[in-house]
Amino acid sequence: MGLLTILKKMKQKERELRLLMLGLDNAGKTTILKKFNGEDVDTISPTLGFNIKTLEHRGFKLNIWDVGGQKSLRSYWRNYFESTDGLIWVVDSADRQRMQDCQRELQSLLVEERLAGATLLIFANKQDLPGALSCNAIQEALELDSIRSHHWRIQGCSAVTGEDLLPGIDWLLDDISSRVFTAD
C-alpha cells in the first residue's frame, strides 16, 4: 500500500475538505459564506484578514477560508494555499470596471504550484442586480476557456437571496470527491 493510498484512506474517513474563497474586495465572499451557513447577511463589513467557518454539508466537513480581497491583502493570499481542495473565486457580476483586474488576479492564482489540482468554482455573484454581466460574458472576460490546469465551473448566484449557491457548492464537492475519495 503506497503513501498516497494511505493518505486517501485517511482522508476518506474524515471526509474533510479545505475550501479557499477568494476574489476582489466587495465581490460578496463573506456574504456567500454567511448565507450558506444560515446567518444574517444584512450587516457585513469588509474582511480585514480572514474568516474561517467549519460547516457540515452532505456528510462532508467543510473548512471554508474566506480571505479579504482588498489590494493590500492580496499578497497574503499565498499564505492560505496549502492543502486546498477547492478554490471558490467570487466575482461581482455588476462591477464591469474591474473585470480585467479580476481576470489578472485569477490567472495569477492558477499558476500557483500549491493550488495545482484544486477544483475551481467561479461564483458570478450579484446576478440579482440590474446590469449584472451574464455568466457567458464573465466566462469570456475572465478567459475561462483557456484554463487547462483545473476542473472549473462558473455558477451565477446571488449571495443576498441565496439563489443558486447550493448547485455551485454541490458541483464543487462532487468534483473534489471524484478526485480525492476514489476507490482503489
From Swiss-Prot:
Tissues expressing the protein: Expressed in brain, lung, cerebellum, liver, kidney, hippocampus, spleen, cortex and heart (at protein level).
GO cellular component, one term: centrosome
Molecular function GO terms recorded: GDP binding; GTP binding; GTPase activity
NAD among keywords: no
One GO BP annotation of this record: negative regulation of GTPase activity
Assigned keywords, A-Z: Cell cycle, Cytoplasm, Cytoskeleton, GTP-binding, Isopeptide bond, Lipoprotein, Mitochondrion, Myristate, Nucleotide-binding, Nucleus, Phosphoprotein, Ubl conjugation
Superkingdom classification of source: Eukaryota
PTM notes: Not N-myristoylated.
Binding, GTP: 23-30, 66-70, 125-128
Effect of T30L: Reduces affinity to GTP and GDP. Inhibits interaction with PDE6D
Keyword Cytoplasm: yes
Places the protein is found: Mitochondrion intermembrane space; Cytoplasm, Cytoskeleton, Microtubule organizing center, Centrosome; Nucleus; Cytoplasm
Similarity field: Belongs to the small GTPase superfamily. Arf family.
Protein name, UniProt field: ADP-ribosylation factor-like protein 2
Source species of the chain: Mus musculus
Source species taxonomy: Eukaryota, Metazoa, Chordata, Craniata, Vertebrata
Gene that produces this protein: Arl2
